[in-house]
Amino acid sequence: MKTITTDWELIPYSEAWSRQTEWFDALVHAKQNGESYENRIIFCEHPHVYTLGRSGKENNMLLGEEQLKTIGATLYHIDRGGDITYHGPGQLVCYPILNLEEFGLGLKEYVHLLEEAVIRVCASYGVVAGRLEKATGVWLEGDTSRARKICAIGVRSSHYVTMHGLALNVNTDLRYFSYIHPCGFIDKGVTSLQQELGRSIDMAEVKERLGRELLAALLSK
């Protein structure tokens, strides 16, 4: 089956979640019934929002409901793995809705593939990134006291079909991370391509590079 790339641009989180779920359910149904389907790689950005995964702890959100309103943000409890994270303008979010079995992937291998694609995109900008032991996502200087996260990853899988995905900080307002313990960490920082390079980064260019890396990785399986 073919894999298509879609760009939702700036979209409210609730609408993106609803669309994702609809396409995810349709792919699961098609797979179970031997029908044709399309794998999708979705790019978007969200207005200010925090999402708390299934294993997340409420105390990693440091603001109450009224305080969230004052910073123009909302909070959603969602069905992905992982803890709490932030999404907002300037952050590239990618939601692959894929039949992993078509690509010969298990869930652990899939998460590794997402990380590797982001690591390669960072490298294309001269930013050296990698993994942190016993943690998901993509990090800079992960084995030092200056460890900082540039990309969060949290997925849901059912019948080897995926939804949710990754969030890469490109030109993200990093102040919004100060209101949470990102991904449950209290002793790790966050960063962005803009922060590391000292300049604004063209979002369309990052989308193109990440889309190319993801497709290449999937097709190599």
UniProtKB/Swiss-Prot annotation:
GO CC terms in record: cytoplasm
Residue(s) at site: Lowers pKa of active site Cys: 149
Catalytic reactions on record: octanoyl-[ACP] + L-lysyl-[protein] = N(6)-octanoyl-L-lysyl-[protein] + holo-[ACP] + H(+)
MF (Gene Ontology): lipoyl(octanoyl) transferase activity
Metabolic or biological pathway, per its Swiss-Prot or TrEMBL entry: Protein modification; protein lipoylation via endogenous pathway; protein N(6)-(lipoyl)lysine from octanoyl-[acyl-carrier-protein]: step 1/2
UniProt subcellular location: Cytoplasm
Biological process terms in GO annotation: protein modification process
EC assignment: 2.3.1.181
Active-site residues, record numbering mapped to chain: 183
CDD domains reported in the protein's UniProt record: LipB
All residue ranges annotated as the BPL/LPL catalytic domain in the record: 35-221
Chief location: cytoplasm
Top EC group: transferase
Keyword Acyltransferase: yes
Keywords on record: Acyltransferase, Cytoplasm, Transferase
Binding site residues for substrate: 80-87, 152-154, 165-167
PANTHER family recorded: OCTANOYLTRANSFERASE
Misc. remarks from the entry: In the reaction, the free carboxyl group of octanoic acid is attached via an amide linkage to the epsilon-amino group of a specific lysine residue of lipoyl domains of lipoate-dependent enzymes.
Role played: Catalyzes the transfer of endogenously produced octanoic acid from octanoyl-acyl-carrier-protein onto the lipoyl domains of lipoate-dependent enzymes. Lipoyl-ACP can also act as a substrate although octanoyl-ACP is likely to be the physiological substrate.
Family label: Belongs to the LipB family.
Protein's UniProt name: Octanoyltransferase
Originating organism: Bacteroides fragilis (strain YCH46)
